[in-house]
Amino acid sequence: EDISTMDKQAIPDHTLLVGGFPCQDYSVAHTLSSSHGIEGKKGVLWWQIRDTIIAKKPPFCIFENVDRLLKSPAKQRGRDFGVILACLAQEGYSVEWRVVNAAQYGAAQRRRRTFIYAYRNDTIYGQKMADISADMIIKNGGLMAKAFPIQNIGQITETVIGGDIVDVSDNFAFAFEAAGYMRKGRIYTSKVIEQEEEPIALGKILQKNVDDKFYITNEKMPKWTYLKGAKKIPRTSANGHEYVFSEGPVAFPDPWDRPGRTMLTSESTLNRSTHVVSDPGTGRLRLLTPIEAERLQGFDDEWTNTGMPDRMRYFCMGNALVVPMITRMGRVLDTIIAEEK
């Protein structure tokens, strides 16, 4: 069912609301019918999440987004995340967030994502956290610090966000760091030094002697070599300005002794971001198999083998979360929810 057309009150009551949503334009304006109402851009999923929160008031929420959410848009850094925080504050929630690189916490992929944890202030957990300082919540007392331990935090910077979401959309800007906490509109944020764990090297997840269809043919090798290599290309912008587009080389093949790069939905297609590995059995260059793509994200082998074509299996994995990162948050949240009963 389309979340944008359904009655949010018809959604069953729930303890935890979970969502992943694109980094879109979160700007808002007052509605034409009311100076108190607000209206976001059509098709922006966040507003459906907000409406669900208003209708159902779940005690806990966990959201996921790309790491650039904290710095977007480029012309008003921090506005988009500020709008999200203002919406949650308005509904009586406190918020923790962390930008997590999965490889730093034992995963097989260097994938940076922003995780957002919100909880109602009137929960048992919310009342308990009200007595803990912001720096302690960021360093070791909050859900994020328990799920993703850190060695230390940097200097905390603070700001206050107002309750008028349109004003936040029009005027708010702030340098959000990789970790932070908000309660009742007061924001605290800092850099962190992660307590790094040994990642899984790419070589550990590779299969041997895979099907011939995954190997790069001699005919396509020059194209792959070009895409992966450094290049400088003269270009002309729409207004006639001439410039040189340049990019450095990408490891070709991808090294076995490091975790994989961030997997995209285009994985396995002929493009610069696709992983190319040396097969452990034959030594020939090839693409990842669907099973290896699943392993990069921490899924069980054959998780996506439902009859869908390989192209869609890669697409699903390029869109997925790194499962062990969610497991880490889930274990902490299990304890929190158990104490509410």
Enumerate the predicted regions with their spans:
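Short SAM/SAH-binding signature in class I
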Residues: 14-20
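SAM cofactor-binding core of SAM-dependent methyltransferases
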Residues: 1-4
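Class I S-adenosyl-L-methionine
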Residues: 6-14, 26-252
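Short aromatic/basic micro-patch
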Residues: 20, 60, 287-290
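Flexible loop residues that form catalytic
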Residues: 22, 66, 268
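Gly/Ser/Thr-rich beta-alpha loop segments that engage phosphate groups in nucleotides
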Residues: 21-22, 108, 320
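C-terminal target-recognition/interaction regions appended to catalytic cores
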Residues: 181-341
